Amino acid sequence: MPKMKTKSSAKKRFRVRPGGTVKRGQAFKRHILTKKTTKNKRHLRGAVSVHETNMGSIAQMLPMAGL
């Protein structure tokens, strides 16, 4: 059986919190920001948790995370 390998793109985008939830960054905050309102950009700040429907695919991409 081959080694289980972590997806490099996933380990750069996700962090596992101590409680077992996964933290991710918000999308739509990199470029073309002039046409977005200040309120919209403010709501995109910070990190949010990955939704439980996506946790299965995250667990496959991060096999060593113990999800």
Swiss-Prot record:
The keyword Metal-binding does not apply. GO terms for molecular function: structural constituent of ribosome. Residues 1-16 have a biased composition (Basic residues). Residues 1-24 are annotated as: Disordered. Disulfide bonds: none annotated. Keywords: Ribonucleoprotein, Ribosomal protein. Belongs to the bacterial ribosomal protein bL35 family. It comes from the Bacteria. InterPro entries: Ribosomal_bL35, Ribosomal_bL35-like, Ribosomal_bL35_CS, Ribosomal_bL35_sf. One of its GO terms (cellular component) is cytosolic large ribosomal subunit. The keyword Ribosomal protein applies. Pfam families: Ribosomal_L35p (PF01632). This is Large ribosomal subunit protein bL35. Gene3D superfamilies: 4.10.410.60.
